[in-house]
Every structure is written in C-alpha cells, then in structure tokens.
C-alpha cells in the first residue's frame, strides 16, 4: 500500500529542489525528516512539508504505522515558468525567469523480514 502527497507551483527551481530530494529517496521517514530538518537549503522546508503530508495521508487514509514507512518514490517535476522584467539602462529590459516546481513524495510500508 502506498500513500502520496503532491505540492504544486512551488517557487523554487526544480534543479535546486532535486539536490535536496535526492538525499531522502529510499530512507525511513524518521531519518528523512531528520535529514531535512538539518539541511540548510530553501527546498528542504517545502519537501519536509510534503513528506509530513504524505505520512499523515498514510496514517489517516490507509491505516499504516509511521514506524514502518519509508520514502518509496520522491521526484520533482518542472512547473510553469513565470516571466518578470527588470528595467536596465537606456530603455533596455532584462527577462527574469522565475521557475516553479511540482514536488511528489510517495511513502510505502517496508516489508518485514
């Protein structure tokens, strides 16, 4: 049995979020939460929030125990890019691309034995 949680349109670059999400893939949820709590990156806050949501979904919707859960799948997809303009000298304009991410975490029960 699996439980999942998705956060969409998070205003962080997918490349930066993938650096953090690679740290927790395949780990027990308690270990993953500890890693995220002490990782000094902006993405770790959002990923921890999604992981806690996935754990709550597993406990409340699927009657799984938190002790047996692990991060089965964790991935970051690219969301839409917001375009912003930055005025420059002599009437020119620079384009800022604000990248967004869709973060998905799937937790499952580890088979005992």
Curated annotation (Swiss-Prot):
The keyword Protein biosynthesis does not apply. SUPFAM superfamilies: Ribosomal protein L22. GO terms for biological process: translation. One of its GO terms (cellular component) is cytosolic large ribosomal subunit. The gene is rplV. Keywords: Ribonucleoprotein, Ribosomal protein, RNA-binding, rRNA-binding. One of its GO terms (molecular function) is structural constituent of ribosome. This protein binds specifically to 23S rRNA; its binding is stimulated by other ribosomal proteins, e.g. L4, L17, and L20. It is important during the early stages of 50S assembly. It makes multiple contacts with different domains of the 23S rRNA in the assembled 50S subunit and ribosome. It comes from the Bacteria. It comes from Carboxydothermus hydrogenoformans (strain ATCC BAA-161 / DSM 6008 / Z-2901). This is Large ribosomal subunit protein uL22. Part of the 50S ribosomal subunit. PROSITE patterns: RIBOSOMAL_L22. Gene3D superfamilies: Ribosomal protein L22/L17 (3.90.470.10). Belongs to the universal ribosomal protein uL22 family.
């Amino acid at each position: 049995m699996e439980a999942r949680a998705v956060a969409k349109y998070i205003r962080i670059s997918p490349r930066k979020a993938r650096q953090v999400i690679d740290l927790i893939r395949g780990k027990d949820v308690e270990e993953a939460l500890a890693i995220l709590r002490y990782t000094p990156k902006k993405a770790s806050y959002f990923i921890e929030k999604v992981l806690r949501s996935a754990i709550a979904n597993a406990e409340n919707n699927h009657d799984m125990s938190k002790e047996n859960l692990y991060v089965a799948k964790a991935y970051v997809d690219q969301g839409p890019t917001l375009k912003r303009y930055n005025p420059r000298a002599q009437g020119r304009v620079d384009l800022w691309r604000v990248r967004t991410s869709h973060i998905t975490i799937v937790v499952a029960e580890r088979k005992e034995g």
